[in-house]
Amino acid sequence: MRDTMNLIPMVVEQSARGERSFDIFSRLLRERIIFLNGQVDDNSAALVCAQMLHLEAENPKKEIAFYINSPGGVVSSGFAIYDTMQFIKCPVATLCLGTAASMGSFLLMAGERGMRVALPNASIILHQPLGGFQGQASDIERHAQNVMRHKRRMIRLYAEHCGRAEEDVERTLDRDFFMTAEDAREWGLVDHVYRRRAGDLPLIAPSS
């Protein structure tokens, strides 16, 4: 069976200079829309960060729409995307469609305040960083200490972006915590739940 992710549609546009074709994601990038679809790893993080930096270079004041459908993945890769979102001058709006789990939910909440959106049937899952290690006891201990540092950092940032006490966040992350879109809005992870495209919603407004 062919991998459907390799079957990327092409968009053909007519202009005074003739015909140009783009893959669908490149065309959406022209509208300042970035997709994270699948695992958060070094490759996907590099693509997302590069696209954000490119759009900032084009227009540092215009927002970026970041669509997320991800089960999570590598913590360090997720932090690379998070840091880029905070570093660039463009406001980054986030939208969850499908699932935002683990690092996916972390990136969803990292969007510009007031511009974090979930679609009504989205699923959001929070949990603490995971780690599985092998080797000498001293190496395992060091890895465990590193995971705990990641956990403390994530707790602090969830609390900061969601307006919750760190103790509350720590209890929530202790086990897999499943949220509906409305649950996520009440918890402070997103600001809005939209069923239909809103004409005044910057996240999905076409570029002019």
Curated annotation (Swiss-Prot):
Q: Which domain of life is it from?
A: Bacteria
Entry GO MF terms: ATP-dependent peptidase activity; ATPase binding; serine-type endopeptidase activity
Q: Name one GO biological process term.
A: protein quality control for misfolded or incompletely synthesized proteins
**E.C. number:** 3.4.21.92
Lipid metabolism as UniProt keyword:
no
- Tell me which Pfam families the record gives: CLP_protease
Task: Tell me which InterPro entries the record gives.
Answer: ClpP (IPR001907), ClpP/crotonase-like_dom_sf (IPR029045), ClpP/TepA (IPR023562), ClpP_Ser_AS (IPR018215)
- Keyword annotations from UniProtKB, A to Z: Cytoplasm, Hydrolase, Protease, Serine protease
Q: Which Gene3D superfamilies match?
A: 2-enoyl-CoA Hydratase, Chain A, domain 1
Instruction: Give the subcellular location.
Output: Cytoplasm
Active site as annotated: 102, 127
Reactions catalysed, semicolon-separated, are: Hydrolysis of proteins to small peptides in the presence of ATP and magnesium. alpha-casein is the usual test substrate. In the absence of ATP, only oligopeptides shorter than five residues are hydrolyzed (such as succinyl-Leu-Tyr-|-NHMec, and Leu-Tyr-Leu-|-Tyr-Trp, in which cleavage of the -Tyr-|-Leu- and -Tyr-|-Trp bonds also occurs)
Gene Ontology cellular component list: cytoplasm; endopeptidase Clp complex
Which family is annotated? Belongs to the peptidase S14 family.
Q: Which NCBIfam families match?
A: PRK00277.1 (NF001368), PRK12553.1 (NF009205)
**Quaternary organization:** Fourteen ClpP subunits assemble into 2 heptameric rings which stack back to back to give a disk-like structure with a central cavity, resembling the structure of eukaryotic proteasomes.
Give the protein's function: Cleaves peptides in various proteins in a process that requires ATP hydrolysis. Has a chymotrypsin-like activity. Plays a major role in the degradation of misfolded proteins.
Question: Per its record, how is this protein called by name?
Answer: ATP-dependent Clp protease proteolytic subunit 2
Q: Which gene encodes it?
A: clpP2
